[in-house]
Amino acid sequence: MYVWLRLARTMLTARSRGRYRMGDESRLSFRCLPSDIDSNLHLNNARYMMLADIGRIDIFARAGLIGLARRHRWAPMMGGLQSVYVREIRLWKRFDVVSTVETWEGTQVIGRHRFVLQDGRTAALVLTTAGVYDSGRGGFVPIDEIVSALGANIRPRPPSEEERIFMAS
């Protein structure tokens, strides 16, 4: 079940997981398949990024960002990522990808994607920065504007110094 099938499954089942609100988490369950592994018989490093993408897309779909972006001709874009691998995910093992919106400032948002084994231990952590580009205005949209357009009335926690550096990179 390569990326397109996993993505289709995520999109088709998004409504069953309910609306995403800032502060919630997206939890998607997967199994490490033969198409996911490297020569060490564990999840290939590139697959972590692909599965984090699916976690982000789940948040976008459930929050209403995909429809909003289409209406405004906006395009969500990755800015950067950091990854830490703690434990391997072996072939056929089940795991969850738990994705959250951590904070934002200006036009940048930080996402967190934790890969959780069945016993609750963290296998990997991927942090991402992203923004939403408005091709009509020729620039990135302030995240507060997006959050407001999604009908949420929430303020982010202040980013730490490390998070600000990450968003600026």
Give residue ranges: language-model regions.
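Short coil/loop residues immediately preceding or within conserved phosphate-binding loops
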Residues: 27, 78-80, 110
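Short amphipathic
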Residues: 23-33
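HotDog/MaoC-like acyl-thioester-processing domains
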Residues: 1-16, 22, 89-96, 100-169
